[in-house]
């Protein structure tokens, strides 16, 4: 089995795998569109848009990332689907593939992903990091048609009283 897509450690949802090296090479080269849902603290302004800021390592030895002018180009589209009690549900689409991209971009937007231990949302007290890869759409190299895989899981906006600050 060969991974075609990957997820950060605490992110959940769909991943794309290939059965062999040939299929892997074809799927890596194929056009893919990923969609994520995130429960975030706050309400992004504007409610939808494009985040286009570069991402770099926090320091040469660090695994963490930050927005910095000398970083690699990183672009993410976002749209607010719902807001309730100061928590927003965002639809996110990474247009580049940087490490921790969506988590860093949400933090830069001022709307940290709930339950994110590295980028400011850990104190939410909720049920883990609320970032889910809800779908991946890709052109199947053998079937010669577009396919979409959807997750049966999604982020949770149902927090007991007092758990979200």
Where on the chain are the PLM-derived regions?
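RNA pseudouridine synthases
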Residues: 1-165
């Amino acid at each position: 089995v060969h991974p075609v897509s990957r997820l950060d450690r605490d992110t959940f949802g769909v991943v794309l795998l290939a059965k062999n090296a040939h299929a892997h090479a074809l799927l890596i080269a194929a056009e893919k569109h990923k969609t994520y849902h995130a429960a975030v603290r706050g309400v992004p302004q504007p409610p939808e848009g494009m985040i286009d800021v570069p991402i770099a390592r926090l320091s040469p030895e660090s695994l963490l990332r930050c927005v910095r002018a000398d970083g690699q180009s990183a672009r993410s589209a976002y749209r607010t689907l719902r807001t309730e009690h100061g928590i927003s549900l965002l639809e996110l689409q990474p247009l580049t593939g940087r490490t921790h991209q969506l988590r860093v971009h949400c933090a830069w937007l001022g709307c940290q992903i709930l339950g994110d231990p590295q980028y400011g949302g850990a104190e939410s007290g909720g049920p883990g990091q609320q970032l889910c890869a809800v779908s991946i759409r890709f052109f199947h190299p053998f079937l010669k048609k577009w396919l979409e895989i959807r997750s049966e899981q999604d982020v949770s906006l149902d927090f007991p009283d007092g758990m979200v600050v």
